[in-house]
């Protein structure tokens, strides 16, 4: 999965990276039904979500729920701006 490689290739320390990945999984569980069954659409959405998770994370982040909430807000804002 490209999104997972993107997350794992980031510069964060291992503990923070685990929190980011957990936040990503929680967020994906919440929104996955909005992207249908087409593999390309799913992959694109997961990549956007991974970027959103990385954008809101900070070194030392320790709350996957906060990563989830903030990343979903970034995604929602991006979709609103796209029209």
Question: What is the meaning of each model-derived region?
Answer:
Residues 3-12, 75-83:
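Short, charged, intrinsically disordered terminal tails
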Residues 4-33:
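N-terminal acidic leader/helix
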Residues 15, 19, 44, 62:
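Charged, alpha-helix-enriched surfaces in structured cytosolic catalytic cores
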Residues 42-58:
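Amphipathic alpha-helical segments that form the core helices of the histone-fold
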Residues 56-82:
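Short, compact, well-ordered microdomains
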């Amino acid at each position: 999965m490209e999104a997972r490689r993107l997350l794992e290739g980031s510069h964060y320390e291992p503990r923070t990276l685990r929190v980011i990945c957990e936040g990503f999984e929680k967020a994906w569980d919440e929104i996955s039904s909005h992207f249908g069954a087409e593999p390309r659409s799913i992959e694109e959405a997961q990549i956007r979500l991974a970027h959103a998770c990385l954008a809101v994370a900070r070194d030392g982040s320790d709350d996957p729920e906060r990563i989830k909430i903030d990343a979903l807000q970034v995604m929602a804002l991006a979709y609103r701006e796209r029209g």
